[in-house]
Amino acid sequence: MVGPDGMLPLPWLEATLRDTLLTRRAHALLLQGPRGVGQFDLAVTLAQAWLCEAASDAARPCGHCASCRLVLARSHPDLMVLLPEALREPLGWNLSDGDEAATDKASKAKPSKEIRVEAVRAAVSFAQVTSARGRCKVVVVHPAERMNDIAANTLLKTLEEPPGQARFVLACSEPEALLATIRSRCQAVPMRLPPAELATEWLTQRGLAEPAVLLAATGGQPQEVLDWVAQGLDAVLWQRIPALVRDGDHGPLTQMQLPRVVDALQKLCHDAACVAAGAAPRYFPAAAVPAGVDLLALVEWSRELDRAARHADHTWNAGLMVEALVLRGQRALTGAGVNAARSANPSGRAMRQGASVNSGP
């Protein structure tokens, strides 16, 4: 959102914001691009621009009119933001009426990662009511791929026959997970990774040490860097991961959440394969990635990591799974060979036990 100083919090969004406001006139937009580049920030800023009472000639929000202040305070009566319950607190948005209804039904369960149908129904009703401040009504959906099938079909009906004054902004990082019919009703706005220099400068301004290392760790996604750091990752630990795996030391990795550990190991596996093929690594410094890996063992490790990724959100036996994955990675990175990996019964049992626990009864 544009603040009273007229500045965007994510500077790399400036050109996309300007282009979208000047050229995209559809009632529904689909912001799509890699995670961590600011889809949600752009979606809310577009809503702010459409609701602004003193927009510039380029339709940019002023940041200081009454409507802009209401958007900044997350209390504009003509703006509804649909988020999974699990993202409400991290992003600082209160529950909508639909979210409250859904939450009352499952108050004892952990926060949902889905956008529920109750929230979408509330948004549909909201869009059909006359604007309170005379501009338009705006519904933001993020991440749009988190709508379950019922919720998505409920929204589709409104996108096909939109109320005259309503506009919709769907933000996502996995557009292929959306219904094809929803994608066809929206005008696409592609978003790309920001220039590394700009993203590194932005991270430096937030006090991060060695931001270039952390930016590479996330594949160039600056907002993902902040999430990783909040969960205990720093540049020193990241650069140690190849050596930790090579030495079979999983202990320091336990300070990271399991999905992050699996993701880090997948990136190490990718980079090890690149180095073995004579290409440059993408995620880790070249000097940190071991050479002389066993390619067959690396393939088996990659398959184990893919299986682990499907269960990474579960907490059962997380420590055992991390240990087993690191041991399998050690054999791949040290060139011990596939046969040695298969003959190592302790890690094999650990992986089977972890898979058995995660698969449920």
Predicted features by range, described:
Residues 1-52, 59, 164-167, 172-361:
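Charged, glycine-rich active-site and insertion segments that engage polyanionic ligands
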Residues 1-150:
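Clamp-loader machinery-focused feature within the broader ASCE/P-loop NTPase space
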Residues 133-138, 163-169:
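Loop/turn-to-beta-strand initiation segments
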Residues 128, 153-167:
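Conserved catalytic/switch belt of AAA+ P-loop NTPases
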Residues 149-152, 334:
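Short N-terminal helix/helix-N-cap motif within the alpha/beta-hydrolase-1
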Residues 125, 157, 184:
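Conserved adenine-binding aromatic site and its adjacent loop/helix in ATP-hydrolyzing domains
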